[in-house]
């Protein structure tokens, strides 16, 4: 899947200047932040909770660990990891978008999750953390919005401890023709109408559908992780490959 030229990239199906994409993506998430959780439940029929639960179980977080929830948005994974790592552990919820970060902070504080979570506005391509710092990094439904995915994956490798684990949960490519046809119909005909009804913003959800189609498929993303230096890379398809969880280790 082409990422464009050195100076250009994809914003959905559009080709844009690479330096413009971050601002354009920011505009999408500023627009949808307040209704993001509601839309996740509606557009996935609640199944996103099952995908995230599998990701958390696969992470194997234990008391005392340091976890980075990258592109953590409204904090679904952070909330679970906070309980798993306990008082001696630390979870960092990082997101490039300050609107999403604000929603996540308020949501977790309303739940009483305050002691072992910190919040950082950060670009995945240049993470502001020391080398060999985290035991686990997760990025759920965020990588496809990153301009330079290869740089982001290398940045994640740098801040992982030796023996650390990266988990990428992302929309991917359905494995069967029937599912692909149903998924296309849903994504391009129904999803934007849902976005218009719930958030008064059909255009942002058109972008989200297009960004999923432009994201590297399962094997391509696996290869990108291997090229960055991750080892024992594997992926698990869920819901016929509509979503895939990629996992790799730093040794």
From Swiss-Prot:
The keyword Ribosomal protein does not apply. Its EC number is 2.1.1.163, 2.1.1.201. Keywords: Menaquinone biosynthesis, Methyltransferase, S-adenosyl-L-methionine, Transferase, Ubiquinone biosynthesis. Pathway: Quinol/quinone metabolism; menaquinone biosynthesis; menaquinol from 1,4-dihydroxy-2-naphthoate: step 2/2; Cofactor biosynthesis; ubiquinone biosynthesis. Pfam families: Ubie_methyltran. It comes from the Bacteria. This is Ubiquinone/menaquinone biosynthesis C-methyltransferase UbiE. The gene is ubiE. The keyword Chloroplast does not apply. InterPro entries: SAM-dependent_MTases_sf, UbiE/COQ5_MeTrFase, UbiE/COQ5_MeTrFase_CS. It is an enzyme of class 2 (transferase). Methyltransferase required for the conversion of demethylmenaquinol (DMKH2) to menaquinol (MKH2) and the conversion of 2-polyprenyl-6-methoxy-1,4-benzoquinol (DDMQH2) to 2-polyprenyl-3-methyl-6-methoxy-1,4-benzoquinol (DMQH2). S-adenosyl-L-methionine binds at residues 74, 95, 123-124. Belongs to the class I-like SAM-binding methyltransferase superfamily. MenG/UbiE family. GO terms for biological process: aerobic respiration; menaquinone biosynthetic process; methylation. GO terms for molecular function: 2-methoxy-6-polyprenyl-1,4-benzoquinol methyltransferase activity; demethylmenaquinone methyltransferase activity. NCBIfam families: MenG_MenH_UbiE (TIGR01934), PRK00216.1-1 (NF001240), PRK00216.1-3 (NF001242), PRK00216.1-5 (NF001244). It catalyses: a 2-demethylmenaquinol + S-adenosyl-L-methionine = a menaquinol + S-adenosyl-L-homocysteine + H(+); a 2-methoxy-6-(all-trans-polyprenyl)benzene-1,4-diol + S-adenosyl-L-methionine = a 5-methoxy-2-methyl-3-(all-trans-polyprenyl)benzene-1,4-diol + S-adenosyl-L-homocysteine + H(+).
């Amino acid at each position: 899947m082409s990422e464009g030229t050195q100076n250009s990239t994809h914003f959905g199906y559009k080709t844009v200047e690479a330096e413009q994409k971050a601002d354009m993506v920011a505009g999408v998430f500023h627009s949808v932040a307040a209704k993001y959780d509601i839309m996740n439940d509606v557009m996935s029929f609640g199944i996103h909770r099952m995908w995230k639960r599998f990701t958390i179980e696969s992470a194997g977080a234990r008391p005392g660990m340091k976890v980075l929830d990258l592109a953590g948005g409204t904090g679904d994974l952070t909330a679970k990891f906070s309980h798993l790592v306990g008082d001696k552990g630390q979870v960092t919820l990082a997101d490039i978008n300050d609107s999403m970060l604000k929603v996540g902070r308020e949501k977790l504080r309303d739940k009483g999750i305050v002691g072992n979570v910190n919040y950082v506005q950060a670009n995945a391509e240049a993470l502001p953390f020391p080398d060999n710092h985290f035991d686990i990094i997760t990025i759920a439904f965020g990588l496809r919005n990153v301009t330079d995915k290869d740089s982001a994956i290398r940045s994640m490798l740098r801040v992982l401890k030796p023996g650390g684990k990266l988990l990428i949960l992302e929309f991917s490519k359905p494995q069967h023709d029937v599912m692909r046809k149903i998924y296309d119909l849903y994504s391009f005909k129904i999803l934007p109408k849902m976005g218009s009804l719930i958030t008064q913003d059909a255009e942002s959800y058109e972008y989200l559908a297009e960004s999923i189609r432009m994201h590297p498929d399962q094997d391509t993303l696996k290869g990108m992780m291997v090229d960055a230096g991750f080892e024992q890379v594997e992926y698990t398809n869920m819901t016929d490959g509509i979503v895939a969880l990629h996992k790799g280790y730093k040794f």
